[in-house]
Amino acid sequence: MNNTKTAQRKALLAAITVFVMGGVTAQAEELPVYSFDEVVVTATRTENDVKKVPASTQVITQEDIKRGGATSVRNALSMYANIFQKSKVRGGGHDIIIRGMETKHSLVMVNGRRISNEADANGLGNAMSLDRININDVEKIEIVRGPSSALYGSEAMGGVLNIITKPSKEQTLLTGLEHTSEDTSHWWHADTGRIGNFSMTLDARFNKINRSMLETATESDPYGTAQTYNASLNYYVNDHSYVNAYMDYYSQHLKTDTGTPTMKPITLTTSSGKMSLSGQAMLEGTGSKAYKQKNYGISWNGKTDKNDWQIQAYMSKFNWSTTSNTKVLGSIPPAGMEGMFNYLLQKKNTYDFNHDEHNMWAIEGRDSLRVNDHHRVTFGAEYVKEKVAGTGLGKNGDGVHSITENGTTKSSSEKTLSSYAAYLQDEIEYGKWFIVPAIRYDHHSAYGSHTSPKIGVTYNATDHFRIKANYGDGFKAPSVSQLYYDLDMEMGRGNWVHLTGNPNLKPEKSKSWDLGVEAEFGKGYGSLTYFDNDVDNLITSIPKGKDSNGHNLHRYENVNKARIKGLENTLGYRFNDTLEFKVTSTLLDAKDTSAGKDLTQRARLSQIYQLIYDDHKDTGWSAVLWNQLDYKFVTGKAWESGESVKKSYSLTNFSLTRKVNKDTRVYGSVQNIFDKKDADCDLDGRFWSIGWEHKF
């Protein structure tokens, strides 16, 4: 272990040394410098070169997505962004950990708009939402690391992921097929191009998820079907403005089961805990999950020499339902205790359900005013109204009523909250300096007001060497669930949990800063950034004993503090126009300072090595060979045992694309080639995919 630790330190030190010395060598030899320009809009809500903006920003282009053979947005992030991902325990989805900040602290947007999801207390909505976005409709993904609450408000404590969909460009019809070790998909993309004053894009994706069940699991993974439809219509008022209307629809129906029923040993305990009986029983378990999302909106967009503005209104609706049904099919009770055993066994006949919805309405307006060639001011305001309704709120909301299903009765209610906000940002260029201060004021009907300041600075020492620094406050408002939950449900067969909200919760807060350097040296490029996050008022569920039904009772409270700091490093080299090598690293120290423990589901050192080949020919090849190294990953067992349980692993992956001609390509990938499995690290083994795409 000590040798491994020393080796990792040496590797990181070597990367830093090469980065620093590489800049000196490049200046001395005056090698040709490759351009890495990319225009981004998320970091400042204005168009800027990615090298110019102070915030640490990364872009995943459509070319990156195709070259890597990505089959989902999550898949693309795992290959090209230094974002740590791990499976959620409940219902699928994947954690999105930016700079050590957990899933609920990252804001996921589509075209700069929020999307409704499970409104879950622990970020399950974010974890699931990436898999609901049609990867074939994605133009690029912009990732901003560090607090962005000064522009985007709540949830942007850790950063922002903005998925930007394909704009209308030219008359096109695309179709494709994908088959993976987990599912099969068929998709279409149509673009009318501009016809008079109109243009339109249409997308459809159909997905069938295979049934699978791990050998150690007691229940299968969810399986079933999903479908996605996207439509976007532009009307060009004149050469300087246009109106956009869009519609997105997503529907998914899944099932779960416990496999073929067999007689298995079982131990039953009386409610008093004074008697236990051992025998055998045959149980059958089934479940279902249904999700439906609808997004609608309209915006008026304009751009002149002085102004770049947008006014928009949109609505996002999300419905989800779950059921869980366990039946006793037979038993072999202990001799002489048949009556008591069968009485206790009948309590295993259970049915549970939950039906919920999360609706969001928003109105936004912003304008960027160019004062002169070196000064731009951006200001905006928004109003958001949210309604959460269903059995998840139980009796804690308004309009309480009962719902009975299959003999089980639950309470259901609803809660409506609203917020308004205004923000101001200044972009100032002064010589080699680019300074961006910003401030935002939010007022929420549940917790009151919050102000979020931020300042970012870029110093362009030369055309190919920059120093960047940022400081900002972030916050995460309590979710409706955390405020008003009254959710009593079966989480795993026979494990009943009763989660209750707390209307007195305060927003989670953070103070963060970072300092970094970026450079291009000859054919190489690199960056090194130190970041430090001090997080307060973290909300977590606290055990409160048992409820009146004997179920485990939990209540949400502001109890924890955390300190998350580390180093990010990117180092790359382009050997020529076709071959590139790149390594990204995050060295992380993430502590729950209240408990004095490591934060779980994070690695001490996470690295991704990539060797990228692309001949850029209409009838050519592209390939990516990459390796993911996670060193001292803190498993979920850390909290169960009271001590940190850490594991290290390395995953090798490969993708290959063949461009048959300028209109057709075939592609495939294998991830976790050596089929590593570890339930503690959420490693499920090898994943493979093959696909075909054709342009008519």
What is each stretch, according to the model?
Residues 1-68, 75, 80, 192, ...:
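N-terminal Sec signal peptide and the immediately downstream disordered periplasmic leader
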Residues 149, 162, 170-174, 178, ...:
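Periplasmic-side early beta-strands and strand-to-turn transitions of outer-membrane beta-barrels
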Residues 74, 78-114:
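Extracytoplasmic beta-strand/coil segments of soluble accessory domains associated
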Residues 85, 115-145:
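Short acidic/polar hinge/loop motifs at secondary-structure boundaries
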Residues 373, 377, 428-434, 531-534, ...:
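Gram-negative outer-membrane beta-barrel transporters
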Residues 236-252, 277-279, 285-449, 460, ...:
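Face-selective signature of the C-terminal outer-membrane beta-barrel domain
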Residues 73-76, 95-97, 109-111, 126-131, ...:
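N-terminal periplasmic accessory domains that precede
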Residues 272, 281-295, 299-303, 356, ...:
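Outer-membrane beta-barrel signature, preferentially recognizing the C-terminal barrel domain
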